[in-house]
């Protein structure tokens, strides 16, 4: 069985962009938990949070994670998926977790360039740069503790994918005596 790959990291780190390209490169299926959830409940994340609160959204997010997990799949997760211990445990036990790490300034620049940035409800009520810094400070340790692989996601997607592939191959050689792909 080819294990699923779970991409974790903050908003703007490239989980969806890198995930789609990685899935193509590895000939795997791609799914984004936020997109899957929104399509299945016919509501945006903002609508879910407004109606059910963050706790309701997080519960739906956990269910989405389990629903989309399948062999030979690259899963782009929501930035806060690691907040729930059950999600961290689930990902570690059911696949390989890859943390796409990037500094605050890179994340803010990417988010400001996205037209849908205003569609996501604020977590702190602060400016984008303050919120990104605060949220990353709180979550970075959880991303790092959960990840099997940590990749510098400040580079172009092609470089990030090359690094992921090399690290997956190293991991496979250490664990199995063979290549991942």
UniProtKB/Swiss-Prot annotation:
GO terms for molecular function: ATP binding; magnesium ion binding; shikimate kinase activity. ATP binds at residues 12-17, 120. Its EC number is 2.7.1.71. InterPro entries: P-loop_NTPase, Shikimate/glucono_kinase, Shikimate_kinase/TSH1, Shikimate_kinase_2, Shikimate_kinase_CS. It is found in: Cytoplasm. Disulfide bonds: none annotated. Mg(2+) binds at residues 16, 32. GO terms for biological process: amino acid biosynthetic process; aromatic amino acid family biosynthetic process; chorismate biosynthetic process. Pathway: Metabolic intermediate biosynthesis; chorismate biosynthesis; chorismate from D-erythrose 4-phosphate and phosphoenolpyruvate: step 5/7. It catalyses: shikimate + ATP = 3-phosphoshikimate + ADP + H(+). Substrate binds at residues 34, 58, 79, 139. One of its GO terms (cellular component) is cytosol. Its main location: cytoplasm. Binds 1 Mg(2+) ion per subunit. Residues 112-126 are annotated as: LID domain. Its cofactor is Mg(2+). Keywords: Amino-acid biosynthesis, Aromatic amino acid biosynthesis, ATP-binding, Cytoplasm, Kinase, Magnesium, Metal-binding, Nucleotide-binding, Transferase. Belongs to the shikimate kinase family. AroL subfamily. The LID domain closes over the active site upon ATP binding. Monomer. Catalyzes the specific phosphorylation of the 3-hydroxyl group of shikimic acid using ATP as a cosubstrate. This is Shikimate kinase 2. The lineage of its organism: Bacteria, Pseudomonadati, Pseudomonadota, Gammaproteobacteria, Enterobacterales.
